[in-house]
Amino acid sequence: MRHKVSGRRFDRPTGQRMSLYRNLVTDLLNYEEITISEPRAKEIRSMAEKMITLGKKGTLASRRRALAFVYMPGIVEKVFEDLSKRYAERPGGYTRMTKLGPRQGDGAEMVKLELIK
């Protein structure tokens, strides 16, 4: 029984799964909106919000933690310079999920995950 076991495995080894999360979070922070399946969106939503919260802290340690997670250093600059100012007054909830319906090929529920303007 898997009572109180959080997180999804997506039928991948840990390294591949973490790489998938890092790529999706990097894309979300870069393009500010992505269309993905609902379970994936639910997994990366909290990670993206944590990156923005690190940007709002603005310390050297938080910048290094963000650089360790996000693949492209330019995205970290964007988070610390632009997004941290945009969400300075907002205490959390930087993302929005909008349901788009099932995907044609396999019927997976698709959502648009976007950063709130």
UniProtKB/Swiss-Prot annotation:
Q: Name one GO biological process term.
A: translation
Origin, by domain of life? Bacteria
Does the keyword section mention Lipid metabolism? no
For this UniProt record, the keywords arranged alphabetically read as follows: Ribonucleoprotein, Ribosomal protein
Task: Look up the record and report any one GO term of the cellular component aspect.
Answer: cytosolic large ribosomal subunit
Q: Which SUPFAM superfamilies match?
A: Prokaryotic ribosomal protein L17
Matches recorded under Pfam families: Ribosomal_L17
- Its Gene Ontology molecular function terms? structural constituent of ribosome
Q: Decide whether keyword Ribosomal protein is in the record.
A: yes
Quaternary structure, from the entry: Part of the 50S ribosomal subunit. Contacts protein L32.
Similarity field: Belongs to the bacterial ribosomal protein bL17 family.
Sorted alphabetically, which NCBIfam families does this protein's record hold?
L17
Please give the name of this protein: Large ribosomal subunit protein bL17
Q: What is the lineage of its organism?
A: Bacteria, Bacillati, Chloroflexota, Dehalococcoidia, Dehalococcoidales
Its gene? rplQ
